Amino acid sequence: MNDQLTEVYASIDALIDYALAHLDLDPRNADWTRNQIFALFRLDSYPGPKTTTSAASVSDVVQDIVGSRSQAPYGEKTPDPLLAAFRAAATTAGLFKPEEGPAYADTIMGILSANPADLDDRFLLVEHRDGGMAAMQWFYDYCVANNYVKRAQLDRNPRFDSHGLTVTINLAKPEFKNMKKAAAGNAVAGGYPKCTICHENEGFAGRDKRTLRTLPVTLGGESWFWQFSPYGYFDQHGICVNTDHTPMHVDRDTFGHLLDFVDRFPGYFLGCNAALPRIGGSVLAHDHYQGGGELLPMHKAATWAAFTLADYPDAVVEILDWPGTAVRVVSKSRQSIIDVSDIIREAWVGYDDAANGIASHDADGNRQSALSPSAIITERGYEMSLIFRNNAISDEYPEGIFHAHPEYWPVKQEPIGLIEAQGLFILPGRLVDQLGIVEEALAEGRDLPDEVSEFSLEWGELAETLAGNHDREAIRQAVHDELGSVCYRILGNTAVFKQKATTQTFLESLGFAAR
């Protein structure tokens, strides 16, 4: 056997060791699993485990990962160094071309991962013993360990707080300026699976989903499933998807679904995008919710004013001190939360207010108004945030009257969905290079470079803030503050009621009285 194959076998042994340590691979299945990997490359000269110096050295990488597990955030482990060693050895040995490496790495991690039924059984054991949140933490750690969740990528994304918001620059997410495909739900060529979030994606090689694992969830007596996002926007970001491929919608049942979920996983939030183009998510053809293990800024927003409804004395509706238009329904009663939320929803989707430029339907009778709800549990009981959205367009604002206005497009042009409406902004990766050019020009006292001329608004405001200060740290802080300010103003663009008093008038028209 040549030295090149020795390195390949050593790297496969290291991955088997990793799976035994972190992916619940049963030792009784180790040889069988190893042979499945060998079969991919017609390997038949295996000398046995760890019989060479190379095997031992690669295996040391496993021990490094195991040894550092307690220091890693969330106790995470990733197979990235082992997969890199395998890809390098395999390409050197001529088993595949370098560009084929990611697909083969995904295939191998799929082989090493537990099958969905076994994983669900293990999840239920943890949940029964330690509760729903401990089980979700276990499942998240597993999805990091099997390389479906790209935690290392998430940790590389720039992130900072500014103007009461959290601003991130996502280095992996593509920027979609044209959202027409949202209505089609990201349909897959060939028709299988029907869209990018259908349950049939679990293990599907055609979309590199070999490592995707989902968990069954029951909402309102219906079959749903949970999966974590591979490139999450925040901690333990995931989606809860209707097992049936049915269009997005928000109705009375939606509120009950969200409460069912947070009852089972009380440390998570779960919310729903407005089910309309331009103000919804990128997949409207398949009903789903978004949530995760991190409270977003709007969940912690202060109250501007509080109201009650005579028929529901155990519920309080709070107008939020927030740049967008949002209220929060608070009660220890599930029924009151659902009833009051639906009263507001039904009123809003049919609400017309010409004086404030609000039309519930367009000239062709298409609905334009929707609510985007988000549920959490706190010491006060259930809290259901309701974000008022409207997707009307005009000659002045063809992308949306209540969308980011054109002067802010250099920073953010994509629609503002549930996550950003709640104060966590996901900005495009191009900003890293573009703002780097801006910072360099400010530090050197030069004019705004032509290649970033679209940032003239931000440049002017930065120049005024810095007032001739060329210190690089001060410039970086000023850029962060400017991005936060722009994001805050974008949320103001999305506000359907520009004044809190107008939101109050709307609630009072429904019979709500100031508390």
Swiss-Prot record:
KW Zinc-finger (keyword) present: no
Q: In which pathway does it act?
A: Carbohydrate metabolism; galactose metabolism
Alphabetically, the GO molecular function entries are: UDP-glucose:hexose-1-phosphate uridylyltransferase activity
Name its cellular compartments: Cytoplasm
Enzyme class at the top of the EC tree: transferase
The domain of life is Bacteria
Query: Might you name a Gene Ontology BP term for this protein?
Result: carbohydrate metabolic process
The GO cellular component terms are: cytoplasm
Keyword line: Carbohydrate metabolism, Cytoplasm, Galactose metabolism, Nucleotidyltransferase, Transferase
Recorded E.C. number(s)?
Answer: 2.7.7.12
Which chemical reaction does it catalyze? Answer: alpha-D-galactose 1-phosphate + UDP-alpha-D-glucose = alpha-D-glucose 1-phosphate + UDP-alpha-D-galactose
Q: Which HAMAP family match?
A: GalP_UDP_trans
Q: What does the UniProt record say this protein does?
A: Transfers the UMP unit from UDP-glucose (UDP-Glc) to Gal1P. Can also transfer the UMP unit to GlcNAc1P and GalNAc1P. Involved in the general galactose metabolism, and also involved in the lacto-N-biose I/galacto-N-biose (LNB/GNB) degradation pathway, which is important for host intestinal colonization by bifidobacteria.
Annotated family: Belongs to the galactose-1-phosphate uridylyltransferase type 2 family.
Protein name per Swiss-Prot or TrEMBL: Galactose-1-phosphate uridylyltransferase
Organism of derivation: Bifidobacterium longum subsp. longum (strain ATCC 15707 / DSM 20219 / JCM 1217 / NCTC 11818 / E194b)
| Lineage, uppermost ranks | Bacteria, Bacillati, Actinomycetota, Actinomycetes, Bifidobacteriales
